[in-house]
């Protein structure tokens, strides 16, 4: 049983012991100085993040899913990352999804006791009909949350890839996962408030994981968001810029190609660069598994 009082996330931060007596600007600078430590902590675990990306990518290539699971702030960060994948990369909402202890309502208010139930973590994943091609990322700043441990154990039992994202190196969750990502951002400015530095570190890591996987899946061309879903005027204008940047085409030509493809950037780019029609561009992209660079190379 983990002694919660000894967790790194529960320690007092000597630098902020008198934060309640500071002028506002000094308070803000103190918080900012502590936040500066987060990027360095994440940098130290880049090899583990890369390993997670490669493992998740391999399974998604086989049709598997990326599933985040967590409680409270950690769970909400998973929901946020999963929710951004469909509009950013046109992924099927079922391919990247999140499960939070306590369900939908826990996004907006605490659900008492949900995080302390191991069986709930397992049962929430059972409802998704998990397979060995799936990847489960358990997010828990303390690395000892029963809900997350139960989820990781169930995922392992069906052969899914398991990844633990914590902020306590050497924590319990590391023994329950195939890959452990445990940066050490240090004690929080407000003791135990893991929505702060720990949450920032977790957000950075989830950004890296989802971005890295999507890049490897061919969802970008260069650094351009060529699979963006043009669901509003801002994003339609972004599509125009993307196509112009990728092809060097004039505004009118880019817009014409996008109108023909219903604002799908990938075929529009191939059409303009290779001089083929929409059907030809789509055929080339299908042969290239949706990768623009490969489609252009023939």
Name these PLM-found stretches.
Residues 34-44, 110, 135-138:
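Short, basic, glycine/proline-bearing loop/turn elements
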Residues 213-298:
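Short, amphipathic alpha-helical interaction segments embedded in low-complexity terminal/linker regions
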Residues 44-59:
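A short, well-structured juxtamembrane/interface segment
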Residues 1-41:
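Cofactor-/ligand-binding subdomain signature composed of acidic, glycine-rich
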Residues 30-38, 98-109, 221, 262:
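Gly-rich Lys/Arg/Thr-decorated short loops/hinges at beta-loop-alpha junctions or inter-strand turns
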Residues 67-204, 213-215:
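Glycine-rich phosphate-binding loops that contact phosphosugars or nucleotide phosphates
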Residues 192-206, 229-242:
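EF-Ts-like protein-protein interaction surfaces
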């Amino acid at each position: 049983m983990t002694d919660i009082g000894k967790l790194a996330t529960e320690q007092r931060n000597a630098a902020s012991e008198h934060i309640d007596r500071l002028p506002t600007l000094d308070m803000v600078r103190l918080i900012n100085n502590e936040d500066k430590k987060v990027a360095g902590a994440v940098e130290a675990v880049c090899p583990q993040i890369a390993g997670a990306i490669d493992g998740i990518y391999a399974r998604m290539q086989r049709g598997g899913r990326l599933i985040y699971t967590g409680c409270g702030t950690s769970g909400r960060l998973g929901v946020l990352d999963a929710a951004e994948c469909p509009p950013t990369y046109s992924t099927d909402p079922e391919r990247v999804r999140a499960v939070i202890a306590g369900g939908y309502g826990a996004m907006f208010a605490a659900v008492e006791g949900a995080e302390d139930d191991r069986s709930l973590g397992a049962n929430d994943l059972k409802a998704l009909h998990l397979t060995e091609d799936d990847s489960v990322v358990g997010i828990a700043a303390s690395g000892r949350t029963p809900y997350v441990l139960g989820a990781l154990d169930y995922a392992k039992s069906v052969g899914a890839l398991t990844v633990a994202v914590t902020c306590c190196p050497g924590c319990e969750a590391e023994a329950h996962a195939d890959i452990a990502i445990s940066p050490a951002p240090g004690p929080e400015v407000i003791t135990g408030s893991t929505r702060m530095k720990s949450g920032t570190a977790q957000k950075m890591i989830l950004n890296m994981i989802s971005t890295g996987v999507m890049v490897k899946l061919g969802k970008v061309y260069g650094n351009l968001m060529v699979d963006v879903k043009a669901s509003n005027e801002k994003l339609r204008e972004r599509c125009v810029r993307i196509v112009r940047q990728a092809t060097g085409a004039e505004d009118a030509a880019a817009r014409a190609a996008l109108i023909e493809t219903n604002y799908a950037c990938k075929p529009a780019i191939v059409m303009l660069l290779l001089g083929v029609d929409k059907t030809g561009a789509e055929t080339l992209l299908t042969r290239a598994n949706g990768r623009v660079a490969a489609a252009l190379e023939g």
